[in-house]
């Protein structure tokens, strides 16, 4: 939400300098449609850090370090299984901001 507001202010400022009109509602809707800024926690380091924080493998989303019952993960050449926990995968890949619904989605 904070990134959307920053982008909306930048768009509104650019609109004001180019056309002379300041319409924040239009700039905010453009910023919402633009999506996430570049980077945004999607690096390999960030994925590995989030996976370690919940004791999962960053490649296949299984428990790491493996137990006696989890033999398919070697943390180098593993792939996700047929049915894996989508919420865990979403948290590892995109971070906590994508797992928790935003305030705008709750109102609709």
Curated annotation (Swiss-Prot):
GO biological process: regulation of DNA-templated transcription; symbiont-mediated suppression of host innate immune response
Cystine bridges: none
Keywords from the named record: DNA-binding, Host-virus interaction, Inhibition of host innate immune response by virus, Metal-binding, Suppressor of RNA silencing, Viral immunoevasion, Zinc, Zinc-finger
Pfam families xrefs: Carla_C4
Highest taxon of source: Viruses
Annotated zinc fingers (C4-type), start-end: 57-78
GO MF terms, alphabetically ordered: DNA binding; zinc ion binding
Region (Basic): 47-50
Family: Belongs to the carlaviruses nucleic acid-binding protein family.
Role: Suppressor of viral-induced RNA silencing. The potential mechanism of action is based on sequestering siRNAs.
Protein name per the record: RNA silencing suppressor
């Amino acid at each position: 939400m904070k990134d959307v507001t920053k982008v909306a202010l930048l768009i509104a400022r650019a609109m004001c300098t180019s056309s002379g009109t300041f319409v924040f509602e239009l700039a905010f809707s453009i910023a919402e449609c633009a999506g996430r800024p570049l980077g945004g926690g999607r690096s390999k380091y960030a994925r590995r850090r989030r996976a370690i924080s919940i004791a999962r493998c960053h490649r296949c989303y299984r428990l790491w370090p493996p137990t006696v019952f989890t033999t398919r993960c070697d943390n180098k050449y593993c792939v996700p299984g047929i049915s894996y926990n989508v919420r865990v995968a979403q948290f590892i890949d995109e971070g906590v901001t994508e797992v928790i619904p935003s305030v705008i989605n709750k109102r609709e």
